[in-house]
Each structure stands twice: as structure tokens, then as C-alpha cells.
Amino acid sequence: DGAYILNLFGDIATELTIRVDGDEGLLRAYDNVEFISPVYAGDFLLIKGKVVKIGNTSRKIGFEAYKIIESIKNAKNNSSCKILDPPILVAKASGTTVVLKDKQKC
């Protein structure tokens, strides 16, 4: 669901700010959040994030979530899945993180 995807985007934001700044920073806001395709229990997601702009203390991040494996609703075998090729874009967003100047790595 949407809250689950936003939580995963937050995890990616934390990883990216640690990689860039050596500090997890604070996710200040999401903007332009779009939920494009439904996600169901049993689906597997690939989450991508990229720092697209670095300011003095702010970092703008673009996020995308793709469904890569889909659960098949099958009465005979409730654990059936299929690989999606190509993956399906299910959500995208951008967000801003803030890392205080004294917390940034040199």
C-alpha cells in the first residue's frame, strides 16, 4: 500500500544521505507523490532512489518503486508468483532531506 511504499522511500533517503554526508539527516518532506499501479500482499518491489540536487544543507531525492514479482492468485497453489519483465512502475516521488552543516562529512 501507499504507506508501505513511502516507508521504503524513507529508508532509501536515509541510506543516500549516509552515503553522501555520513549522517542520516532528516527527511523534511515528500512532494509530487504518485501512486501509479496497485501493490498487493505477496508482490516484490524494487526501490530506486537518486540524489538529484545538493544544496547547502538540503538534498533533493527522486524515488521510484517497481513491482518485479507478482503474486498469482491461484486456488490450487497460494504461493505461486511470476517475474514481471519489464517491471511495473507502481509509485514515484521526490523528497527533500536536510543534513545540518556540522553533521556533514568533510
Annotated model-derived regions:
Residues 13-54, 58-59, 73-75:
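Hydrophobic beta-strand-centered segment that forms part of the acyl-chain substrate-binding groove
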Residues 40-44, 52-106:
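HotDog/MaoC-like acyl-thioester-processing domains
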